[in-house]
């Protein structure tokens, strides 16, 4: 396995670790509605950071974006909006299925759809089947899916042992939302594929290969921001128990406390895709679809590890922890299989 591929896998791991940890600061926010908290964090992660970093990277910010036709920018934006819809469905999936089943189904579907649809759309899926390296990477995707399933099973055992139940368990509604979440969340993978002309243009301007994907985030995350912020602002305006004015009428120290924590959560959320871009840059072009598989499987892996570190599994008993550990090992094996396949 080459050093470039190894570093690509490593940066995807770092990005996934940030994704697994990003909600921790949000949990410390006090006396704010989820909608206000999510909006503040989202403004930082989807608007401020993408724009600021792109302004630093590009020699001429406005000239870069105005150089693209609407036919180039629109698919990137719409796939970003698609991914934003997946974000909203993710929370509803947890509500009706519970954390473990919801995450397992949603992540499993988005891993498959986001990973395999890209080479199918690009018309080179047959190359993957007909080459040794391609077959090896596909095997890695299958093993990763098995690993996600094992971790999901561990979560179910933990919830059963600790008496944790879904907020409003509804299997039929939850499954529909989980499938929708999985499909729509793959929009980020499709957006990255559609944004290749933007990456190439950034490279032509002399942007370092590690950073060429970052300017496209202005458009991708702009699509996601409109969906997420629109959802939050509509709820803040229409739901009687929610009030943006009330949330910002608290004592000044508490407002500052909440804003800083929400901004930190937004920063950590953005960093997952900052390092995703670094990892994506190190993956061989013919296997760039594997970036999504690495990100999502490492997200599940890091989520399990973070749960152990935060002692969330302390009262779950030995069996759930053993199953979780097995699932984490399987995901690590999957990453190595994919790495070997890409090296071939």
Curated annotation (Swiss-Prot):
GO CC terms: plasma membrane
Membrane topology category: Multi-pass membrane protein
Keyword Transit peptide applies: no
Protein name: L-rhamnose-proton symporter
Lineage: Bacteria, Pseudomonadati, Pseudomonadota, Gammaproteobacteria, Enterobacterales
Record-linked Pfam families: RhaT (PF06379)
Presence of the UniProt keyword Membrane in the record: yes
Gene name of this polypeptide: rhaT
Keyword entries, A-Z: Cell inner membrane, Cell membrane, Membrane, Sugar transport, Symport, Transmembrane, Transmembrane helix, Transport
